[in-house]
């Protein structure tokens, strides 16, 4: 698979006299079409890392390559057009008086012709299942709907990469599921590369790979199965465990012989049913 993002020994400090860097010797590669989750407790450097990928921050040292282009002041705007970001608070992202006006805002800034703009807005709203709300005021939407509109605004720009920077952290479980299912659908249809910056372990379970940050350093990377199987280590890093792992731990304490490998909620349900039927 062709790499779309490459980071090599990235270092960054917010202030020159900071004793601890926000990022320290971070290196990894993301392939085109992958879904990557970056997890870590507050202050681990995960959001700083996201901002170096799209050029909001330029690293003090190291190399960032996006789409085979090295991030520097000369091509920073080209790279930013390749990367769309959805932030934590949807209310801080709206500038239009209606949903369709808001989705069109970024297109207007890029000078997209009106005829093409109308097509892109309609297409983006259909992809996030919000077409029927096109003339609605954003303030009258639920949290999950607002984030879906924010995603539509990014999708309309047709980036190669979408970064979700704690995009579900302020939503209730229903809104969170709305956003995750929307991203899954768009990724499958458009072969987008998705980077999810999150502390929500259940959200991270949707990724192809997970990167674990601690105090500015990349300390682990692997598939959800590989990462979540190291339960005690995650707890030591200040992270939670996915629900299936918590359930397995509780069953084990009651003397139930449980599988050692990580299981999704769906696989856990199947295993429980099989265990009951085989008794």
UniProtKB/Swiss-Prot annotation:
Residues 5-240 form the ABC transporter domain. Forms a stable energy-coupling factor (ECF) transporter complex composed of 2 membrane-embedded substrate-binding proteins (S component), 2 ATP-binding proteins (A component) and 2 transmembrane proteins (T component). Belongs to the ABC transporter superfamily. Energy-coupling factor EcfA family. The lineage of its organism: Bacteria, Bacillati, Bacillota, Bacilli, Lactobacillales. ATP binds at residues 40-47. It is a peripheral membrane protein. This is Energy-coupling factor transporter ATP-binding protein EcfA. Keywords: ATP-binding, Cell membrane, Membrane, Nucleotide-binding, Translocase, Transport. CDD domains: ABC_cobalt_CbiO_domain1 (cd03225). Its EC number is 7.-.-.-. Gene3D superfamilies: P-loop containing nucleotide triphosphate hydrolases. Its main location: membrane. It is found in: Cell membrane. ATP-binding (A) component of a common energy-coupling factor (ECF) ABC-transporter complex. Unlike classic ABC transporters this ECF transporter provides the energy necessary to transport a number of different substrates. GO terms for molecular function: ATP binding; ATP hydrolysis activity; ATPase-coupled transmembrane transporter activity. One of its GO terms (cellular component) is ATP-binding cassette (ABC) transporter complex.
């Amino acid at each position: 698979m062709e790499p779309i993002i490459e980071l090599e020994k990235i270092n960054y400090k917010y202030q020159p006299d900071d004793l601890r860097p926000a990022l320290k010797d971070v290196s990894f590669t993301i392939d085109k079409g992958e879904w990557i989750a970056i997890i870590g407790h507050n202050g681990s450097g995960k959001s700083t890392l996201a901002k170096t990928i799209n050029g909001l921050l330029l690293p003090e040292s190291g190399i960032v390559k996006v789409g085979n282009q090295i991030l520097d002041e000369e091509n920073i705007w080209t790279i930013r057009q390749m990367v769309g970001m959805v932030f934590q608070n949807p209310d801080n992202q709206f500038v239009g008086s209606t949903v369709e006006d808001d989705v069109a805002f970024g297109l207007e800034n890029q000078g997209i012709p009106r005829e093409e703009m109308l097509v892109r807005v309609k297409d983006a709203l259909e992809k996030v299942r919000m077409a029927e709300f096109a003339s609605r005021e954003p303030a009258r939407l639920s949290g999950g709907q607002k984030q879906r509109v924010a995603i539509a605004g990014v999708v309309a720009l047709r980036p190669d990469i979408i970064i979700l920077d704690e995009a579900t952290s302020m939503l209730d479980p229903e809104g969170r599921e709305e956003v995750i299912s929307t991203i899954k659908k768009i990724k499958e249809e458009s072969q987008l590369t998705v980077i999810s910056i999150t502390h929500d372990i259940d959200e991270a379970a949707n990724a192809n790979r997970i990167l674990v940050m601690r105090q500015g350093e990349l300390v682990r990377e692997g598939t959800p199965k590989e990462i979540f199987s190291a339960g005690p280590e995650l707890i030591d890093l200040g992270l939670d465990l996915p629900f299936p792992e918590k359930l397995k731990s509780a069953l084990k304490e009651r003397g139930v012989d449980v599988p050692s490998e990580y299981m999704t909620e769906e696989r856990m349900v199947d295993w429980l049913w099989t265990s009951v039927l085989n008794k």
